[in-house]
């Protein structure tokens, strides 16, 4: 999937590693969400959104009780959604409730990223906060990964408004990412690395 966004490219790489068999619930998604085709496995995807204009299967607020029985889904997706939910605790608790035993929750959230709408932008979470949020909601086997390559991926994102063509992004993203990797190779655990300056998780 072509996109000029460094973060989106990282998100799509992560989603392409997923394999889920069974029904999936995509919170905040739409029928036009291009990342659905990246997920491997035999599944159907139902989308739920607060905004009907997104072209969604179901309209409901993820901050309220979800209209599904316990253990209804093999997978739940939160793709760039949790930062928009003021009551993220209810959303995470409900996601754990509707997942089948052994089901998969997969999500991405921005960190070093501009304030954005849809409909409002409330939070930025660190790795430590995400791990605790998920544990508090009842999740086990939690894995959180940084997205981006470090400070230069953040710099690229700040310049994104000037990158008007995908072909230019195809040149600049490997360049900026390569600089980050070179810095980390010379000085591992530096404070410009993705561990300290992630675009997201």
What are these regions (language model features)?
Residues 2, 6, 56, 79-82, ...:
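Short N-terminal micro-motifs specific to bacterial/archaeal maturation
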Residues 5, 18, 76-77, 140-142:
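Residue-level marker of intrinsically disordered, low-complexity segments enriched
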Residues 17-116, 127-131, 198-200:
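Conserved SAM-binding loop
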Residues 86-90, 94, 104-201:
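S-adenosyl-L-methionine-dependent methyltransferase catalytic module, highlighting the catalytic core
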């Amino acid at each position: 999937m072509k996109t000029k966004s460094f973060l989106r490219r990282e998100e799509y790489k992560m989603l392409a590693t997923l394999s889920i068999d069974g029904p999936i619930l995509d919170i905040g998604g739409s029928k036009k969400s291009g990342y659905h085709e990246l997920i491997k496995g035999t599944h159907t995807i139902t989308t739920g959104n607060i905004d009907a204009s997104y072209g969604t299967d179901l309209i409901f607020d993820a901050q309220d009780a979800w209209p599904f029985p316990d253990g209804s889904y093999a997978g739940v997706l939160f793709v760039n959604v949790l930062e928009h939910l003021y009551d993220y605790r209810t959303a995470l608790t409900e996601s754990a409730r509707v997942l089948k035993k052994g089901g998969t929750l997969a999500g991405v959230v921005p960190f070093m990223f501009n304030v954005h709408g849809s409909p409002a932008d409330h939070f930025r979470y660190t790795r430590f906060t995400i791990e605790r949020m998920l544990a508090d909601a009842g999740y086990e086997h939690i894995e959180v990964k940084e997205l981006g390559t470090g400070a230069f991926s953040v710099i690229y994102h700040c310049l994104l408004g000037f990158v008007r063509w995908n072909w230019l992004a195809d040149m600049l993203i490997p360049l900026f990412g390569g600089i980050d990797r070179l810095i980390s190779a010379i000085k591992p655990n530096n404070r410009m690395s993705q561990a300290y300056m992630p675009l997201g998780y």
